Design a protein with these regions (language model features):
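Conserved acidic catalytic loop of the alpha/beta-hydrolase fold
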Residues: 341, 351, 444-445, 456-473
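A short, hydrophobic beta-strand element of the alpha/beta-hydrolase
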Residues: 502-504
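Short glycine-enriched nucleophile-adjacent loop
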Residues: 478-479, 484-495
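Acidic, low-complexity Ser/Thr/Gly/Pro-rich repeat segments typical of extracellular/periplasmic
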Residues: 21-305
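Bacterial N-terminal signal peptides
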Residues: 8-17
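Catalytic active-site module of serine/aspartate enzymes centered on a nucleophile-bearing elbow/loop
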Residues: 632-670
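Cap/lid segment of the alpha/beta-hydrolase catalytic domain
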Residues: 303-331, 335-336, 352-357, 361-459
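The feature captures the conserved acid-bearing segment of alpha/beta-hydrolase catalytic domains
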Residues: 506-642
Length: 670
């Protein structure tokens, strides 16, 4: 009876305090009706393999595909927002990161690692508190016209496989009345710390809580009590908390590290074509070679069903999802893929060292192919650097008249699934353009694993270089656009295979990057509009949040710091005006999307003059003119192409200790 009185007294107090206003401000929390702050560990409930278990009403409904993709993940986004809803409009000035909105890194009881726990995902301690406006920011959610929803945005990627806890306080005020927020009545029950909500026989201990309600709320109560105890240990008084929740971030690099750990050389051969770069309008300083590389293909190739490329994804043994608990993907087949290489010839004035040519791995951008290497080959050859290029997954040469076309090995698989003129589904008798199906946003897991396959392919190439006679102690990397995006995870997990790297116009936060791209955005928005997702709506933004969560394990932003920590790094950005029209420098409302967030996460110094450092440089160069294609195409601005290529060559040839900047008039001076 005493406990019944205590909880009733608490509820009465809330009602009395709130009685002075017609509509008290309440932090919404009603798990029984699906009203939860997100991301939230309650969405693991019922999982048997450590993946999310978000309810899906009808798995056969195509509209549920996005949720089903989320349910293949072992946690929540490292880059996405945290969201909570209140009962009425909020005063935005009262939303202060680190003051009224607190974010903590915490340790959690992981039921997969500790099956004996009786409190799955309970917070056990605070590791550290994150800094407001340095690690995260908070604002009103733009798509909520009621102005009653808050959005907490990381300014740096959260750690993978890590627990986090959010606590909102009564310093959050209503917009109309300036009155403080209160906890939801359900949350008041959930924070009750004087004992269980149920008796040993399962009946409720409280008159205003039914047996079924108490039974459902009791496991949540244990989590909330643990959260508030942890918050109190960090100096936050429990009486000031109006809502708290916790979540665990997903794994990101586990699968790629598993692949790297088991990596061995596979057959890699090259043969001269009898052509040099003069045959492709170059200076003729490099001879052109073609060959093949064997590699494990962790996706399904379209041997019998062409459309399998639209839905395939990485799987473990027994078709298990790839997670931190099961990181090793199984390759359904080994493919032989085409390789293009360039090597300095006599016209370059260079002689091959006894140890073999120093070599640069080159990765082209989306919708391009391996022949993009040839636009850079002469500059590399003049410095005594050979180069090797392979295609990104689902990319390749589609013109059968191209002398480097390989009819049986192109990784476009000669697919004809769309009309090349209109983009409409259905064959037109022509091979689909290179990369058409690479970022398939209708199957987010496929898009993620096409990115990861690109990394795995480059790892295999790097591990097999010695078979073609290259000097494996002098290996550099150049990635352009999406080639640089794939290159950053490569550099984070390569463990010594590669040295210095030049990353030309990369970007992170892929989902909003694509949506905000002047090149890709209109097509993506039109495709989503055809499914009923309209820009500016809540459903539209929810899709992009989900897309980013799925793509996180293949997104450069989650690998950027590790990549820069391990490699001398040179990053190129076009800031204009106009700025890069393909990979945006930054994206309003998405602080981890674009090139600038990568640059910041990698902690690169901006430079406008020649730089030296015997320990290796970490430099970003911002160009004031040029275009996204300027690395390879002098058309938009020949001076920019010359300067970019000279920077790359000087940087790689010096093992990342020298960055020559000759034309200072076309680069930003910090």
């Amino acid at each position: 009876m005493l406990r019944r009185y205590c909880i009733s007294a608490i509820l009465s107090l809330v009602c009395l305090v709130a009685g002075a206003q017609s509509a008290p401000l309440v932090a919404r929390f009603d798990p029984a009706n699906g009203v939860l702050p997100t991301p939230n560990n309650l969405l693991f409930a019922g999982s048997v393999d450590g993946t999310l278990n978000i309810p899906v009403a009808d798995p056969s409904d195509p509209a549920s595909a996005t949720v089903q993709a989320l349910n293949a993940l072992d946690g929540f986004s490292t880059t996405g927002p945290m969201i909570a809803t209140f009962s009425s409009a909020l005063d935005p000035a009262s939303l202060v990161a680190g003051v009224t909105v607190r974010l903590f890194e915490v340790e959690l009881e992981n039921p997969v690692l500790n099956p004996a726990t009786d409190s799955p995902f309970a917070v056990t301690r605070v590791v550290q508190e994150l800094n407001g406006e340095i690690d995260f920011t908070v604002n009103l959610l733009a798509t909520d016209p009621a102005q009653s929803t808050i959005e907490i945005l990381p300014l740096r990627p959260l750690k993978p496989k890590t627990g986090y806890m959010v606590a909102l306080t009564d310093g959050i005020l209503g917009q109309a009345s300036a009155a403080p927020a209160f906890p939801d009545l359900t949350y008041i029950f959930a924070r009750y710390e004087r004992g269980p909500l149920i008796n040993p026989d399962g009946s409720s201990r409280f008159a205003n809580l039914s047996d079924s309600q108490a039974q459902a709320l009791e496991p949540i109560r244990r989590l909330v009590v643990a959260q508030e105890h942890a918050a109190a240990s960090a100096g936050l008084r429990k009486a000031h908390i109006v809502l708290s929740w916790s979540f665990m971030t997903e794994s990101t690099d586990d699968a790629l590290r598993a692949i790297r750990a088991g990596l061995t050389a596979l057959p890699f051969t090259l043969a001269p074509t009898g052509l040099d770069t003069a045959s492709v309008q170059g200076a003729g300083l490099a001879d052109i070679y073609t060959g093949t590389l064997q590699l494990p293909y962790y996706l399904d190739a379209p041997t019998l069903i062409p459309t399998v490329v639209l839905t395939t994804r990485w799987r473990g043994a027994n078709e298990a999802e790839i997670t931190r608990y099961n990181p090793q993907p199984v390759a359904p087949q080994t493919l032989s893929i085409p390789v293009l290489a360039s090597m300095p010839n006599a016209a370059s004035g260079q002689s091959q060292p006894a140890s073999g040519w120093p070599v640069v791995l080159f990765q082209h951008g989306i919708t391009r192919n391996r022949t993009d290497l040839l636009a850079l080959a002469d500059s590399l050859a003049a410095a005594g650097l050979a180069a090797v290029a392979i295609d990104l997954p689902l990319h390749g040469i589609t013109d059968s008249d191209n002398p480097f076309y390989n009819a049986t090995m192109e990784r476009t698989f000669n697919l004809d699934l769309i009309n090349n003129e209109t983009g409409a589904p259905g064959p037109d008798g022509l091979i689909d353009p290179s990369g058409t199906h690479f970022l398939n946003l209708a199957s987010l897991l496929t898009a993620r694993d096409n990115l990861r396959q690109g990394v795995a392919d480059l790892l295999q190439l790097a591990a097999s270089l010695e078979q073609a006679g290259f000097d494996t102690n002098q290996v550099g990397f150049v990635g352009h656009s999406f080639g640089a995006i794939v290159g950053i995870p490569l550099l984070a997990v390569d463990d010594g295979l590669i040295g210095p790297a030049s990353l030309v116009m990369p970007g992170g936060g892929i989902a909003k990057l694509l949506e905000s791209s002047a090149s890709f955005g209109p097509q993506i928005q039109a495709s989503l509009a055809a499914t009923g997702l309209i820009p500016g709506t809540s459903a539209y933004e929810s899709y992009f949040r989900a897309a980013q969560q799925v793509l996180d394990a293949g997104d450069a932003i989650n690998y950027a710091q590790a990549a820069a920590d391990k490699h001398p790094t040179h990053l190129v950005e076009i800031i204009g005006p106009p700025p890069d029209q393909t990979i945006p420098n930054s994206v309003p409302g998405a602080p981890l999307s674009g090139t600038e967030p990568l640059l910041q996460t990698m902690e690169l110094n901006s430079a406008g003059t020649t730089q030296n450092d015997s320990n290796g440089l970490h430099i970003a160069v911002r160009f004031l003119s040029g275009a996204h294609s300027s690395l390879l195409d002098p058309g938009p601005d020949a001076e920019v192409t010359i300067e970019m290529q000279q920077q790359i060559v000087g940087f790689l040839a010096s093992a990342g200790t020298l960055l020559p900047i000759d034309n200072t008039s076309i680069v930003f001076q910090p």
